[in-house]
């Protein structure tokens, strides 16, 4: 079975992320969403909370699995027999950075390719960073995040 992986910090998962996951789930029989533990990043939600929020957000997708990881992505890819890495690219700045990561991951995994998904037009401006900034300044993020994330933010 072809399996792809969509790695990210997802702090929090946004509707842009969810759109990419849903589109990937239509194309591929198995999509793994790998929620990264990034000690160098100051996250709003813990790894466990982020994994659970992603799980709740993709519960309607039967071919999507969610897990957290702290290892090198290349090692996770080898452990799960991954065929390709899914990445979202919003801008040319994203693309340049992702191109470098794709080359590195291809080297470290002995050939696993990265597939770049542009966002749907209505999500092109959405990022986890922007969502956190709006939230931390008291703004309304209801239209930018899945319902489980919005509820978790309201409860904080």
From Swiss-Prot:
Family matches, as SUPFAM superfamilies: Nucleotidylyl transferase
GO CC list: cytoplasm
Superkingdom classification of source: Bacteria
Residue positions binding ATP: 9-10, 17, 88-90, 98, 123-129
The protein's required cofactors: Mg(2+)
CDD domains named among the record's database cross-references: PPAT (cd02163)
GO MF term (any one): ATP binding
Keywords, in A-Z order: ATP-binding, Coenzyme A biosynthesis, Cytoplasm, Magnesium, Nucleotide-binding, Nucleotidyltransferase, Transferase
Root EC class: transferase
UniProt: substrate binding residues: 9, 41, 73, 87
Reactions it catalyzes: (R)-4'-phosphopantetheine + ATP + H(+) = 3'-dephospho-CoA + diphosphate
Primary localisation category: cytoplasm
Keyword Hydrolase belongs to the record: no
Protein purpose: Reversibly transfers an adenylyl group from ATP to 4'-phosphopantetheine, yielding dephospho-CoA (dPCoA) and pyrophosphate.
Protein name listed in UniProt: Phosphopantetheine adenylyltransferase
Species of origin: Haemophilus influenzae (strain PittEE)
Gene name for this UniProt entry: coaD
């Amino acid at each position: 079975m072809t399996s792809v992986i969509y790695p990210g910090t997802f702090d929090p998962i946004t509707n842009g992320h969810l759109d990419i996951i849903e589109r990937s789930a239509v194309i591929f029989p198995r999509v793994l969403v790998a929620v990264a533990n990034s000690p160098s990043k100051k996250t709003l939600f813990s790894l466990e909370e982020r994994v659970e929020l992603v799980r709740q957000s993709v519960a309607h997708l039967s071919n999507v699995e969610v897990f957290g990881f702290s290892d090198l992505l290349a090692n996770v890819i080898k452990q799960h027999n991954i065929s390709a890495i899914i990445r979202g690219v919003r801008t040319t700045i994203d693309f340049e950075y992702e191109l470098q990561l794709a080359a590195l991951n291809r080297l470290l995994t002995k050939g696993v390719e990265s597939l770049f998904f542009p966002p749907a037009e209505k999500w092109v401006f959405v990022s986890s960073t922007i969502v956190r900034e709006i939230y931390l300044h008291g703004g309304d993020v209801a239209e930018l995040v899945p319902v489980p994330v919005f509820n978790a933010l309201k409860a904080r």
